[in-house]
């Protein structure tokens, strides 16, 4: 894939091909790591049901913590990529923005992961610890040929707007410079400003799905705009796993990301 021409590690390239579509060179990832931060939310109480639904809808990968994989994160259905999330923190912690490392790259490999991910809150009081973790783990990933996704979120006492183009661009660039192969970050809300974020980041950017939107059309239009601005995919959790038609909304996202269909056409995939 052209966007990964700078990566010479064969192991990384093989794994990246499992989570990125070879034709579109984009990805649709469904994060389901929310159980650690927020508890057993609706939609992920039984991860196997949701994993099967998003796999049937065409998603490229699911993302979750190691425990769910060991307990069985899927039941039947088509193959789907697996991303192991290495960071943890809870909403009931004295410092919800602090994320700590709870597994290893080697453990993720033993579970058959196609990539690992880390969460970094840029601007948090403990952000320097997360930067150190990202930098060190990127070296381990390079050694083992494991793709690394950095979730780079502007979040902390000095962050007034988490979608501010300047802070989003800074967060994305920071993740790339510390060794991430793929950056997940906020969409700025505007294609023109997001283009500048993409220009300033040497690693491909996948947008976060964000909080649950009011309408499917609003959400899908955001995905459409981000792809046209240079985004290389979407990683959306709640807007997918809490949808009434999980398979349908996943298929709608895939239609936009991989086939560049219009929002009106993609909405036809949703049956409920």
Curated annotation (Swiss-Prot):
What is the protein's given name? Answer: 2-amino-3,7-dideoxy-D-threo-hept-6-ulosonate synthase
Q: Disrupted gene: resulting phenotype?
A: Cells lacking this gene require both aromatic amino acids (AroAAs) and p-aminobenzoic acid (PABA) for growth. In the presence of PABA and AroAAs, growth of the mutant strain laggs about 30 hours behind that of wild-type strain. By complementing the mutant strain with the expression of aroA', the strain grows in minimal medium with acetate only. Aryl acids do not replace the requirement of AroAAs for the growth of the deletion mutant strain.
Question: Subunit structure of this entry?
Answer: Homodecamer.
Per its record, what are the GO molecular function terms?
A: fructose-bisphosphate aldolase activity; hydro-lyase activity; transketolase or transaldolase activity
**Highest taxon, organism lineage:** Archaea
User: Gene that codes for this?
Assistant: aroA'
Q: What is its EC number?
A: 2.2.1.10
What this protein is reported to do is described as: Catalyzes a transaldol reaction between 6-deoxy-5-ketofructose 1-phosphate (DKFP) and L-aspartate semialdehyde (ASA) with an elimination of hydroxypyruvaldehyde phosphate to yield 2-amino-3,7-dideoxy-D-threo-hept-6-ulosonate (ADH). Plays a key role in an alternative pathway of the biosynthesis of 3-dehydroquinate (DHQ), which is involved in the canonical pathway for the biosynthesis of aromatic amino acids and which is also a precursor for the biosynthesis of p-aminobenzoic acid (PABA) in M.maripaludis. Does not possess fructose-bisphosphate (FBP) aldolase activity.
Keywords linked to the UniProt accession: Amino-acid biosynthesis, Aromatic amino acid biosynthesis, Schiff base, Transferase
Please name the top-level EC class of this enzyme.
Answer: transferase
So where does 1-deoxy-D-threo-hexo-2,5-diulose 6-phosphate get bound?
Answer: 33-37, 153-155, 209-210, 237-238
The entry assigns this protein to a family as follows:
Belongs to the DeoC/FbaB aldolase family. ADHS subfamily.
Q: What does UniProt list as catalytic? A: 33, 153, 184
Q: Which reaction does it catalyse?
A: 1-deoxy-D-threo-hexo-2,5-diulose 6-phosphate + L-aspartate 4-semialdehyde = 2,3-dioxopropyl phosphate + 2-amino-2,3,7-trideoxy-D-lyxo-hept-6-ulosonate
**Among the record's GO biological process terms, what is one?**
aromatic amino acid family biosynthetic process
Q: Pfam families from the entry?
A: DeoC (PF01791)
